[in-house]
A protein has these predicted regions:
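Gram-negative/organellar outer-membrane beta-barrel architecture
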Residues: 1-175
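Transmembrane beta-barrel strand/turn architecture of Gram-negative outer membrane proteins
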Residues: 171-179, 187-194
């Protein structure tokens, strides 16, 4: 389902201009990919990162994507699994761990999530659930822990000339989400985004 490269070529003979044959060469992407990188940022310091992707996890058509980023003042580890599409729906789930120590604020966060994305023409919707635990330690202030179970619904319309390389059109997005004390959250909340 994934391509490493696609090369399209034509015969450049002007005599064939009315009906020129087109040659298409497709190379399938490797089913597994590992990557490594290093860099430096002025606000988080030196970093190294590793990534791994498997486009056919457990030989079931599941896409697996994971990454580890270690910076001097921030670290992150994630793993996501995308199940094969079923009709217009695509389900996914994942886990995330993040830790940071920036400007006197230490944050340690773990999250589990699941989502269903549905595509109908140029309209994409997503319903997502996320369970998150955070430890927050501000310098000179008491630390605290928070727990959140949130639900989020996203509506997105893409009216562009080319989804992969748009040159004209627009994208509209609207999100609504929230959590409740009665359902594992420390606070009742509602949020909107557009």
């Amino acid at each position: 389902p994934h391509f490493g490269s696609v090369i399209v070529d034509i015969e450049r003979d002007p005599a064939l201009a009315a009906a020129v044959p087109v040659r298409v060469r497709v190379t399938e992407a490797l089913p597994r990919y590992a990557g490594a990188g290093a860099g430096y940022s002025t606000n988080t310091g030196a970093r190294v990162e590793l990534s791994y992707r498997d486009s056919n996890l457990r030989k079931r058509g599941w896409e697996f994507s994971s990454g580890l980023r270690i910076e001097e003042r921030r670290q992150a580890l994630f793993a996501d699994v995308f199940l094969p599409p079923r009709g217009r729906d695509r389900d996914s789930f994942g886990a995330l761990y993040e830790a940071s120590d920036l400007e006197g604020l230490k944050i340690d966060s773990q999250a589990l999530g699941a989502a269903r994305t549905t595509l109908r023409g140029d309209i994409e919707t997503q319903l997502a659930l996320r369970l998150q635990h955070e430890n927050i330690e501000p310098a000179g202030a008491p630390s605290r822990s928070t727990n959140t179970l949130s639900a989020n619904w996203t509506w997105k319309k893409r009216a562009v000339d080319n989804v992969l390389d748009p040159t004209s059109g627009y994208v509209l997005e609207f999100q609504v989400g929230g959590g409740s004390k009665t359902l594992l959250s420390d606070q009742d909340f509602l949020r909107f985004y557009s």
